[in-house]
């Protein structure tokens, strides 16, 4: 298995992802939200890029939808939820469709359409993602959503964790950047270095300490959502 990493949504190129098995990672916080909502009984998740598109999706059947997302890490006016995974409790999301738009994560998902498989990953389901990738028997590209086109330490360390899980079970051929991600994770298995991430500090400034604690937990969820035909299940 060949494994490569793309460091932000801005760096996604057709030739890198075509026919590959892709994992999109945005641990702070879009993919953590998506995984959590589905784990708590959400029927499906529809990722969109623009706020207007999200509003259009729900306008004719509002009661069956949850609107979630953020801009600049803050809740969007008129939406039901922000980008906090802790808001997506079972009593709110069960049986409903979540339409979500975020600054980085949903754009990364929508840019990956030429991939063979598109999985949704985070630290909270990292080992399960690794096991799914092994079962797919295909070359892998891990897409880090990044932060406004820039490299993110948090997504990169999560990539390293998933790579480390795969490498323990099978032979892998890593690109240089994948080797660095695995090395960085192995040097920081307690997740302390994530606290140096710019976006981590931004969320900390907003007082969302419980979000950060939750998103930095490993393997508390066993599902691996997959994006197909515009829907994540």
Curated annotation (Swiss-Prot):
SUPFAM superfamilies: ComB-like
Pfam family, one: 2-ph_phosp
Native species: Clostridium tetani (strain Massachusetts / E88)
Lineage, uppermost ranks: Bacteria, Bacillati, Bacillota, Clostridia, Eubacteriales
Membership in a protein family: Belongs to the ComB family.
GO MF, one example: 2-phosphosulfolactate phosphatase activity
Keyword Membrane: no
Gene3D superfamilies: ComB-like
Superkingdom of source: Bacteria
Catalytic activity: (2R)-O-phospho-3-sulfolactate + H2O = (2R)-3-sulfolactate + phosphate
Protein name: Probable 2-phosphosulfolactate phosphatase
InterPro entries, sorted: ComB-like, ComB-like_sf
UniProt KW keywords: Hydrolase, Magnesium
Cofactor(s) demanded: Mg(2+)
Keyword set includes Acetylation: no
EC number assigned by the record: 3.1.3.71
């Amino acid at each position: 298995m060949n494994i490569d990493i793309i460091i932000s949504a801005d760096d996604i190129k057709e030739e890198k992802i075509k026919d590959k098995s892709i994992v999109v990672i945005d641990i702070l916080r879009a993919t953590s939200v998506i995984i959590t909502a589905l784990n708590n009984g959400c029927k499906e998740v529809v990722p969109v890029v623009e706020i207007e598109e999200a509003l259009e999706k729900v306008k004719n059947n509002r009661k069956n939808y949850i609107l979630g997302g953020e801009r600049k890490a803050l809740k969007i006016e008129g939406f039901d939820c922000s980008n906090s995974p802790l808001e997506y409790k079972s009593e709110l999301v069960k049986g409903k469709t979540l339409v979500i738009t975020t600054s980085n994560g949903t754009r990364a998902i929508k840019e990956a359409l030429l991939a063979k498989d598109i999985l949704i990953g985070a630290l909270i389901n990292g080992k399960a993602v690794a096991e799914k990738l092994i079962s797919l028997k295909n070359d892998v590209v891990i897409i880090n959503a990044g932060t406004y086109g820039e490299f993110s330490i948090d997504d990169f360390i999560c990539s390293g964790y998933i790579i480390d899980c795969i490498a323990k079970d099978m032979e892998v051929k890593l690109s240089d950047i994948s080797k660095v991600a695995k090395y960085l994770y192995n040097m920081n298995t307690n997740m302390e270095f994530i606290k140096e991430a710019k976006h981590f500090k931004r969320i900390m400034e907003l007082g969302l300490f419980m979000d950060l604690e939750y998103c930095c937990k490993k393997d508390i969820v066993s599902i691996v959502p997959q994006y197909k035909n515009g829907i994540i299940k």
